[in-house]
Structure formats: structure tokens, C-alpha cells
């Protein structure tokens, strides 16, 4: 009998750590922020945005910025993306748009000014938080794992800075 030449349970080993639960994540991130005054929490598909905003708003009262508030109006985004849509629900066209194309340049400029003038730490939350954040910001990618652990969320530190190197 022929033996299968594929791995039924593929995995990738990562360095660093995975942290579960927003209270623990926020506590750990506050320790790791050091002198950094900006924390960008970029959200992966499937993360409950309101849950994340609520958790961070409790700890960083009045200092949480929602990327959704920096987006262009819905009508403008529809106009921007309509050329990629078709009548077929399964097929469309691959877009050449970037995340920055969905953001309102004036709102982003105002947000960046507010960030640069801030005295206390600011948390930017949402898809594209790392795009809005300054280069020296601590960037965290948050993702949800509902299949295995209910509605628990995980954070993985990566990108421009990681507390694990």
C-alpha cells in the first residue's frame, strides 16, 4: 500500500508567544510599551471590533482612536470599488486598491497631528491601525479563534517592533 506524502496536520513553529484574553493582553502591552506613546492594534478578519474597543477604552479612557472613524464615507467607498464588482456573487475582479485608498486623507492627517501632540499614550484600533500609526509605534495584530476557544481573542506582536526580540 502506498504511503501518503502529505502532512495531515501541518503546523508552523513561531517564536514569541500567544496571549489569550483582553485583560491579560492589555496588561502585558502596557508593560511592554516602555516610552512609546502609541499602540496600534490592527485587527484581523473575524475579530469583534466593538469588544476590542470596549476593552481598551476601559484602560485608556479617552485615548482610543477608531480607524473606522478615519474612513471615507460609504458612498465614496462604493464608488471607489464598484469597478471591481460583478453581478456574480462568487466572482469579481482582484483590486489594485490599497488600504490607504479607503482612508480619508484629511481625517488621517488630523489624527496624526493629534497623535503627535498627545501627552499621554494613545491606542489606535481597527483594520489599518498600523497604516495610521507613526513608525515608532508598537504594533499588535489581533485575531480571533472562535473555533477552539469560544470568543477569546489573541494578540500577536509583529511588524515594526515586537516585545519578543
Please give the residue ranges for each predicted region.
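Glycine-rich P-loop/Walker A and Walker A-like loops and their local beta1-loop-alpha1 context
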Residues: 15-29, 36-57
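A short, charged/proline- and glycine-enriched loop
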Residues: 34-37, 120
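Short glycine-/acidic-enriched loop or helix-start segments at secondary-structure transitions
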Residues: 50-52, 132-135, 158-159
